């Protein structure tokens, strides 16, 4: 998977906008950031809950690392070249779900929940 493929999927999620965030690019819904892209374009940071984070770390330790803000784990750093596209899409959808309005989430269930 590459950043352009991840970007296309993120932008397909209802209400998503891409905007700068310091030196990063960010994907937001309702003004809330659910994923960022570091300047290198080789990684994707997704802000998922602890359950999703630990599940992804167990399934794909070569592609996922804990993402920290200070001492707190806040999501995942995904090495895009090592990640399966279906997994990246699932994680992006999970991160979007945490920030999107409930009506949007109900109207757009994750088609890859088991990926």
What are these regions (language model features)?
Residues 1-115:
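Charge-dense, helix-prone N-terminal extensions
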């Amino acid at each position: 998977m590459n950043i352009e493929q991840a970007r296309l999927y993120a932008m397909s999620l209802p209400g998503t906008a891409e905007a700068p965030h310091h030196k990063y690019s960010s994907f937001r819904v309702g003004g809330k950031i659910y994923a960022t892209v570091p300047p290198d374009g080789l990684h994707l940071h997704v802000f998922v809950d602890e359950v999703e984070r630990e599940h992804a770390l167990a399934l794909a330790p070569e592609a996922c690392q804990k993402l920290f803000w200070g001492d707190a784990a806040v999501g995942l750093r995904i090495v895009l070249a090592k990640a399966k596209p279906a997994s990246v899409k699932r994680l992006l959808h999970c991160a979007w779900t945490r920030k999107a309005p409930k009506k949007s989430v109900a109207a757009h269930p994750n088609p890859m929940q088991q990926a």
